[in-house]
């Protein structure tokens, strides 16, 4: 525990590592397999020992609610009078008992990750969430006292079409109606927060040979979504910076020849300046016309020497 971090004086406990879902874009699912889950008794022992020092805790896991003892963990932390923070909850794991424990301690915001606006694209990325499940779980969230639901979504996914992007708007509009109806019934104002990021291809995943969508394409899609959501009440749109997406994609797929760029970043040179000054070098790594060198020349990928175990 320390006050000198982003999550100051918060007890962070890893409850599991890895994920059973194997979404095709997710590095953690493939790099951390097989999944490891720590017993509730050990987790609560750590919490009891730290309780005199803080009343704030966060649970670390790729899929927190996949833990087979998650209800016991949350109940035990609640009995210790911890304020519990969950980064997000897997959609199919949302159940009333979990929501009630969180709501009882005053939590009113929740985050989930549908990733795409329709079932076709979710199936392609191996995200096992139907539209009906998404609506049902959102209704359950708002019915249990939550007033803010954040939705993590992506644009630029492999096989994505313009219709898929429009379906993001339709899906959010459907969930907005649920939020308004449940909020009105309880005398509350409910809000949806679609947070849209660019798909970043990662090493050691089935999509490692994919390229980042063009900057022009990403800008158009994010601008379209911003325009659509600006006209929706009870919706607060959050969009990723395209420059940030390019930088993340470069960090994910660069090789040792980019060491000088990293050194400049570490010395404090603004990323925006680096993207401008090294535009061609960075573009050669992240542009749609440039795939993993191994796929073109037979040369080993920059990350091929890294063991996932």
Question: Where are each of the predicted segments found?
Answer:
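N-terminal pre-triad scaffold of radical SAM enzymes
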Residues: 2-24, 198-200
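Anion-binding and metal-coordination hotspots
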Residues: 4-8, 33-36, 107-109
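Short acidic (Asp/Glu) and glycine-rich catalytic loops that position anionic groups and cofactors
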Residues: 20-27, 51-56, 82, 116-119, ...
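Flexible glycine/acidic-rich beta-alpha junction loops that bind and position SAM and/or redox cofactors
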Residues: 21, 68-70, 97-98, 120-125, ...
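Iron-sulfur (Fe-S) cluster-binding segments and ferredoxin-like electron-carrier domains
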Residues: 25-42
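Conserved SAM/AdoMet-binding glycine-rich loop
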Residues: 45-193, 201
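Acidic, Ser/Thr-rich peripheral helices and adjacent loops at domain boundaries
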Residues: 106-109, 212-225, 257-267
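Radical SAM enzyme core and accessory elements
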Residues: 222, 231-309
């Amino acid at each position: 525990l320390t006050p000198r971090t982003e999550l100051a004086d918060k007890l962070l406990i890893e409850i599991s590592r890895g994920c059973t879902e194997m979404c095709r874009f997710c590095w953690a699912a493939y790099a951390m397999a097989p999944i490891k889950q720590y017993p509730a008794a050990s987790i609560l022992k750590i919490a009891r020992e730290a309780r005199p020092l803080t009343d704030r805790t966060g649970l670390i896991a790729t899929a927190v609610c996949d833990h087979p003892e998650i209800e016991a963990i949350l109940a035990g932390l609640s009995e210790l009078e911890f304020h519990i923070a969950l980064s997000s909850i897997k959609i199919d794991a949302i159940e009333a008992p979990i929501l009630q424990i969180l709501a009882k301690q005053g939590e009113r915001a929740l985050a989930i990750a549908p990733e795409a606006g329709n079932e076709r694209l979710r199936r392609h990325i191996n995200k096992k969430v139907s539209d009906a499940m998404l609506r049902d779980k959102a209704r359950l969230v708002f019915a249990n006292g939550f007033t803010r639901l954040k939705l993590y979504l992506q644009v630029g996914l492999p096989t994505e079409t313009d219709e898929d992007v429009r379906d993001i708007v339709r899906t959010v509009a459907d969930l907005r109606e649920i939020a308004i109806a449940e909020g009105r019934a309880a005398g509350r104002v409910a809000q949806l927060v679609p947070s849209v990021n660019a798909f970043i291809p990662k090493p050691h995943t089935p999509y490692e040979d994919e390229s980042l969508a063009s900057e022009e394409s990403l800008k158009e899609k994010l601008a379209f979504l911003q325009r659509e959501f600006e006209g929706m009440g009870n919706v607060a749109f959050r969009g990723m910076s395209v420059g940030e997406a390019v930088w993340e994609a470069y960090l994910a797929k660069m090789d040792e020849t980019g060491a000088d760029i990293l050194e400049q970043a570490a010395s404090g040179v603004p990323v925006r300046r680096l993207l401008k000054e090294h535009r061609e070098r960075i573009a050669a790594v992240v542009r749609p016309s440039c795939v993993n060198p191994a796929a073109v020349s037979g040369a080993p990928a920059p990350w091929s020497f890294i063991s996932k175990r």
